[in-house]
């Protein structure tokens, strides 16, 4: 009984595969939390950047409260939940353990997130300014901006989900 009180891990059955499954699940949970956080921070930074540029360009250019609510509910919360609840990668036990003091979002990931956020914002703003040039301020331009931002964020979900795609990026 003393051994159970001082142990870091107690296996309640005689199957060591239980320990392997627990390690795999723990690594998957950590990776999923990281993916969801990276997704949410990156996409929200892109929303903020678009909002700042739109506000600086003119008061009639901002998205409506309903559009912002839709973006936050549909293209932030639902994909974030999907990333957080994803199944473990097949090679989760083949990877070395992460360093004990590593932050949940390492500095190189922060730089990549800023670049990704800027890319989403730039594509959205390009659509916004094309809409302004073609239609002028109004619902058509807002719709183009809204759809570009939503689509960019939803596509970014796929990018966050696939770690093998992430590793193809420059600097990785």
Which residue stretches match the model-derived regions?
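Membrane-embedded transport module
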Residues: 2-168
